[in-house]
């Protein structure tokens, strides 16, 4: 299910509000992730003209993480705004939360789920 928050507004890159939903849909269709989570300034409602879009893609994979980051990155073209991509498996997320990883915990608790695969 695709959910784009209303607070994504044209700040610095007018195309984010228009382009992000299409990009998330392409990632969801091609890679079948468990979740796509928006985090950082766009998710927290305080983007600046220099802000990038931060995405965490949670998916099962046997490929090296760098390969999946490239796979996701290619699905974002044409890229009209800067994007930072993290790809993690559900197990990596679970392990990070057990270890009290602040960064992952913040993404999971404060981030906005843009897509969640139906169960």
Where are the language model's segments positioned?
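Catalytic core of pol beta-like nucleotidyltransferases
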Residues: 1-35, 44-49, 60-119
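Conserved H-loop
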Residues: 41
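Short, conserved active-site loops that position catalytic residues or coordinate cofactors/metal ions
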Residues: 51-53
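Short hydrophobic/aromatic beta-strand micro-patches
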Residues: 56-58
